[in-house]
């Protein structure tokens, strides 16, 4: 079930290093999977079947995301088993760990809106949230220290902090997209907040929008789609802030 609240899974971008004579990794994935345009997907319904790759066009180019039941997206890399999430516009491959790397809180605190950010500014200093610090340490010990860093490229991770206030209740725009409209987006809104936004880095978390594209729907149980692994994990998408409690979207077990 896809909910808002508070274990996480790490994701990062894998660069294709195949020879130009051969098909690239991205081309092989496209050749072996059917594609469907995002305009033809009903995101108000969870996906319980093999839908293939959803194509989404953005100013950066076309991205592809696996949706629904997927049995051919397993990858072994850096001594870990991963699932392929999709293809980025630069043909790098987005992966997610099959099992969570750890169990921990996203943030030490949740009594301020800023704590929904992967990073936030305090006294003119950028502070890593709990989860960001762990991601950096995990990447160092698992990827860099084992000489896999050259295979990984930085990509954009969206921690959408854009929001509006209604009767003292702050709603993030992810709340509107995923609960009200059921219309996920991989375009990250610009923000002037002192937390969140777009982060260009080599490791991160999926957004709730990406979970929705994969086949999840807020408040609906789905034990069939490939992101379900029996664990609860965070996304980077804040949901709301009310009565001194900040909530993020999570994927429940």
Residue ranges and their predicted role:
Residues 1-23:
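C-terminal, structured domain-capping segment
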Residues 22-253:
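Long, domain-scale functional regions
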């Amino acid at each position: 079930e896809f909910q808002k609240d508070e274990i996480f899974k790490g994701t990062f971008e894998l660069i294709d290093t195949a020879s130009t004579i051969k098909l690239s990794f991205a081309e092989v994935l496209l050749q072996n999977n059917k594609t469907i345009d995002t305009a033809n997907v009903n995101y108000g319904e969870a996906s319980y079947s093999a839908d293939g790759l959803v194509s989404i066009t953005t100013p950066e180019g076309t991205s592809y995301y696996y949706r629904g039941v997927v049995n051919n997206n397993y990858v072994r890399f850096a001594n870990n088993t991963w699932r392929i999430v999709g293809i980025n516009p630069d043909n790098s491959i987005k992966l997610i760990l099959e099992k969570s790397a750890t169990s921990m809180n996203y943030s030490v605190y949740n009594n301020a809106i800023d704590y929904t950010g992967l990073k936030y500014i305090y006294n003119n200093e950028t502070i890593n949230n709990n989860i960001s610090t762990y991601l950096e340490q995990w990447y160092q010990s698992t990827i860099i220290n084992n000489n896999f860093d050259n295979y990984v490229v930085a990509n954009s991770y969206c921690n959408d902090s854009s929001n509006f206030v209604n009767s003292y209740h702050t709603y993030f725009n992810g709340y509107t997209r995923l609960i009200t409209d059921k219309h996920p987006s991989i375009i990250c809104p610009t923000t002037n907040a002192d937390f969140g936004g777009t982060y260009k880095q080599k490791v991160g978390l999926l957004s709730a929008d990406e979970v929705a594209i994969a086949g999840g729907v807020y408040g609906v149980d789905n034990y069939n789609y490939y992101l379900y692994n029996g664990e609860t994990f965070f996304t980077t998408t804040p949901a709301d802030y009310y009565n001194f409690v900040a909530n993020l979207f999570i994927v429940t077990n």
